[in-house]
Amino acid sequence: MGLDFTLVADAEDLVAGVDEVGRGPLCGAVVTAAVILDPTRPILGLNDSKKLTEARREKLFDEICEKALSWCIARAEVEEIDELNILHATMLAMQRAVEGLSVTPKLAMIDGNRCPKLAMPAEAVVKGDSKVPAIAAASILAKVSRDREMAAFELIYPGYGIGGHKGYPTPVHLEALARLGPTPIHRRSFAPVRQAYEAREALGEIQS
């Protein structure tokens, strides 16, 4: 069952929903999205991306891109995560997503308990991807986009299982990291990766 569109602000107000995917993984970018929905073109079945099947997310991804008034997918790269830390990199990526919208919203509703610095008012909504349709839509765009990227990395860096765990610190990933060493897409600032780098640097076996 999808979210109720009566939960959003009045249709005359342009509200952007903003969400992120990829704060916890050991590798890859953190990906964000901002979406302004069109009240005259409702999208049925919007919900927190984690509560939807992959097939449903893929279908909704295309529908959101087609029907939304405006949408933007943005990111902060591994190098930025390592330089800034994951929280600040996430805020930067959210800022980029909102700034990339072709329409300027009157309000940005951010999933979570922190808001990035924006040119318009912002409101943090804890578990917003389960409450606010625009945030749910943003969560779907961000997750599908990042999952596709992880599937591509699976082919570039075989043996790590990236396409399955999406970079999260699962036992499979940690074992592969210890056995194969880190790749260029791993986040050096995260402890398991840093430890793997130190071990491999001692042996001169860092991948390039």
UniProtKB/Swiss-Prot annotation:
Domain RNase H type-2: residue ranges? 13-202
Where it mainly occurs, coarsely classed, is cytoplasm
Stated EC number for the protein is 3.1.26.4
What does this protein's record comment on cofactor binding? Manganese or magnesium. Binds 1 divalent metal ion per monomer in the absence of substrate. May bind a second metal ion after substrate binding.
Please list the GO biological process terms of this entry. DNA replication, removal of RNA primer; mismatch repair
One Gene Ontology cellular component term attached to this UniProt record is: ribonuclease H2 complex
What compartments host this protein?
Cytoplasm
**Which cofactors does this protein require?**
Mn(2+); Mg(2+)
Q: Which residues bind a divalent metal cation?
A: 19-20, 111
A GO molecular function for this record?
Answer: RNA-DNA hybrid ribonuclease activity
Q: Which Gene3D superfamilies match?
A: Ribonuclease H-like superfamily/Ribonuclease H
According to UniProt, the reaction catalysed is: Endonucleolytic cleavage to 5'-phosphomonoester
**Which keywords describe this protein according to UniProt?**
Cytoplasm, Endonuclease, Hydrolase, Manganese, Metal-binding, Nuclease
Name the InterPro entries for this protein.
RNase_HII, RNase_HII/HIII, RNase_HII/HIII_dom, RNaseH-like_sf, RNaseH_sf
Family from the record: Belongs to the RNase HII family.
What is this protein's function? Endonuclease that specifically degrades the RNA of RNA-DNA hybrids.
Per its UniProt record, what NCBIfam families does this chain match? PRK00015.1-1, PRK00015.1-3, PRK00015.1-4
Protein name (database record):
Ribonuclease HII
What lineage does UniProt assign to this protein's organism? Bacteria, Pseudomonadati, Pseudomonadota, Gammaproteobacteria, Pseudomonadales
Per UniProt, what is the name of the gene that codes for the protein in this document? rnhB
